[in-house]
Amino acid sequence: METILGMTAIAVALLIGMGALGTAIGFGLLGGKFLEGAARQPEMAPMLQVKMFIVAGLLDAVTMIGVGIALFMLFTNPLGAML
């Protein structure tokens, strides 16, 4: 039982940690490309900004789904019934 709980804790930590890391990298790339595009064509900046916020929302949604799955694994522990 302790092995399953330990592995579940490791899986939750990896899921949340890698999700946060991926989101941070994604936001960095997204912001950099937005600034590059706005500097290259300033008249397109409002349209690019709207698209950037849509993609940023989708990027956050993926991380929140991962956090939800991690909390499900942590509190309900579907693997505990295997014992």
From Swiss-Prot:
It comes from the Bacteria. The keyword Transport applies. SUPFAM superfamilies: F1F0 ATP synthase subunit C. It is a multi-pass membrane protein. It is found in: Cell inner membrane. The chain crosses the membrane at residues 10-30, 52-72. It holds the Pfam family ATP-synt_C. GO terms for cellular component: plasma membrane; proton-transporting ATP synthase complex; proton-transporting two-sector ATPase complex, proton-transporting domain. InterPro entries: ATP_synth_csu_bac/chlpt (IPR005953), ATP_synth_F0_csu (IPR000454), ATP_synth_F0_csu_DDCD_BS (IPR020537), ATP_synth_F0_csu_sf (IPR038662), ATPase_proteolipid_c-like_dom (IPR002379), F/V-ATP_Csub_sf (IPR035921). One of its GO terms (molecular function) is proton-transporting ATP synthase activity, rotational mechanism. Keywords: ATP synthesis, Cell inner membrane, Cell membrane, CF(0), Hydrogen ion transport, Ion transport, Lipid-binding, Membrane, Transmembrane, Transmembrane helix, Transport. The record marks 60 as: Reversibly protonated during proton transport. One of its GO terms (biological process) is proton motive force-driven ATP synthesis. F-type ATPases have 2 components, F(1) - the catalytic core - and F(0) - the membrane proton channel. F(1) has five subunits: alpha(3), beta(3), gamma(1), delta(1), epsilon(1). F(0) has three main subunits: a(1), b(2) and c(10-14). The alpha and beta chains form an alternating ring which encloses part of the gamma chain. F(1) is attached to F(0) by a central stalk formed by the gamma and epsilon chains, while a peripheral stalk is formed by the delta and b chains. F(1)F(0) ATP synthase produces ATP from ADP in the presence of a proton or sodium gradient. F-type ATPases consist of two structural domains, F(1) containing the extramembraneous catalytic core and F(0) containing the membrane proton channel, linked together by a central stalk and a peripheral stalk. During catalysis, ATP synthesis in the catalytic domain of F(1) is coupled via a rotary mechanism of the central stalk subunits to proton translocation. HAMAP family: ATP_synth_c_bact (MF_01396). Belongs to the ATPase C chain family. This is ATP synthase subunit c. It comes from Shewanella oneidensis (strain ATCC 700550 / JCM 31522 / CIP 106686 / LMG 19005 / NCIMB 14063 / MR-1). The lineage of its organism: Bacteria, Pseudomonadati, Pseudomonadota, Gammaproteobacteria, Alteromonadales.
